[in-house]
């Protein structure tokens, strides 16, 4: 809502989380759907080409991707930031399962001014029904978000639930480790049956 709107362009890489395109279109933003390779990764040639041809105001990178679980590399995120003149949104709903997180880039002394990282309590915290999430972004973006945020977008119960959940961070990390190990066990077993298993760093 903040960076979309009439006369602007958003880029997604399909297949991916459908709400990026749907919400962008409700603001009359033009949505361009780029593709992925056979392993559902975003390739650097496709990324560069779509940025060059479309000049997007918004570029969405879901990592690990929903619904494929495919992680993107730091190199892909770096390339998106360096080539794009618009805002790069990295959706890390499954970020705690991944080896790389774009949040680390925002901790640098020279953090990217166009990068937004979004996360949710729905996955690793098992709080999907609460509908609670957050973003990590450069300070200049926060007043822009405030311009479009609903006045009652986050009730007190959600805030309390989120604060209580954070007390159990160690337990969450332990659960992530267990789920990741089970994911690998199942992937190995399926590969042993002769099935192709796509690389995943989701749950």
What does each model-identified segment do?
Residues 14, 33-38, 92:
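Short beta->alpha connector loops at strand-helix junctions that form conserved
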Residues 1-9:
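Phosphate-binding glycine-rich loop
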Residues 199-203:
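Conserved PLP cofactor-binding pocket of PLP-dependent enzymes
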Residues 27-31:
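A short helix-loop-beta submotif of the ANL/AMP-binding
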Residues 25, 42-54, 67-124:
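Active-site pre-lysine segment of PLP-dependent enzymes
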Residues 19-21, 114-191, 195-198:
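PLP-dependent aminotransferase class I/II
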Residues 11, 58-62, 89, 134-136:
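Structural motif
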Residues 14, 60-64, 119:
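Short beta-strand segments
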């Amino acid at each position: 809502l903040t960076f979309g709107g009439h006369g602007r362009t958003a880029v997604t890489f399909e297949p991916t989380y459908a709400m990026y395109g749907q919400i962008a279109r409700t603001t009359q933003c033009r949505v361009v759907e780029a593709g992925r390779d056979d392993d559902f990764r975003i390739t650097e040639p496709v990324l560069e080409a779509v940025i060059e041809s479309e000049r997007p105001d918004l570029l969405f990178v879901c990592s690990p991707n929903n619904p494929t679980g495919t992680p993107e590399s730091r190199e892909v995120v770096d390339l998106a930031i360096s080539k794009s003149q618009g805002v790069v949104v990295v959706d890390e709903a499954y970020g705690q399962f991944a080896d790389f997180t774009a949040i680390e880039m925002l901790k640098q002394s020279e953090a990217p001014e166009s990068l937004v990282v979004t996360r949710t309590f729905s996955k690793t915290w098992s709080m999907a029904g609460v509908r609670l999430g957050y973003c990590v972004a450069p300070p200049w973006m926060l007043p822009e978000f405030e311009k479009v945020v609903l006045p009652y977008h986050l009730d007190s119960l959600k805030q309390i639930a989120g604060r209580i959940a954070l007390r159990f961070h160690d337990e969450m990390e332990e659960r992530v480790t267990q789920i990741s190990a089970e994911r690998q066990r199942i992937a190995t077993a399926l590969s042993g049956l002769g099935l192709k298993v796509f690389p995943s760093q989701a749950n």
